[in-house]
């Protein structure tokens, strides 16, 4: 038990939902701390990583492929374009639709972001055996699936 646990309700300390949320907050804070010196944040790295993975995409397809709603995606892309990390160009088929692509600087930030995420995930599993790490991933996937299934019935 950690000293901090005394400040948290005893039921929360052993509740999977609380623990998953707390782990995510700590992880996100650490990612932001490593990305901030490079002028980006965890919120901005998501679309960058998506473009790095999929290549140039239509803005509307980025919304579909992510958990980000259209207005928030537009704001993120405006910010990324202002930082010189992406370039939006109208498509010849529909000049209202924008094709979004990483710039050279955006590709460098994607490489950095990928490294930060991989390194922090490895740090989170430090001291775990390969079997424990695999079991943790499987259990988290089941936890998420259970919650998503429950959410569909609401």
Spans of model-derived segments:
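Short secondary-structure boundary/capping segments
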Residues: 8, 64, 90-92
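Short, flexible segments with low predicted structural confidence
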Residues: 2-8, 18-19, 33-35, 44-45, ...
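Short alpha-helical transmembrane interface motifs in multi-pass membrane proteins
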Residues: 13-17, 103-106
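C-terminal regulatory/oligomerization modules of transcriptional regulators
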Residues: 1-12, 131-154
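N-terminal helix-turn-helix DNA-binding core of bacterial DNA-binding proteins
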Residues: 11, 18-21, 25-72, 83, ...
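Charged, amphipathic alpha-helical coiled-coil/dimerization segments
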Residues: 28, 56, 78-141, 145
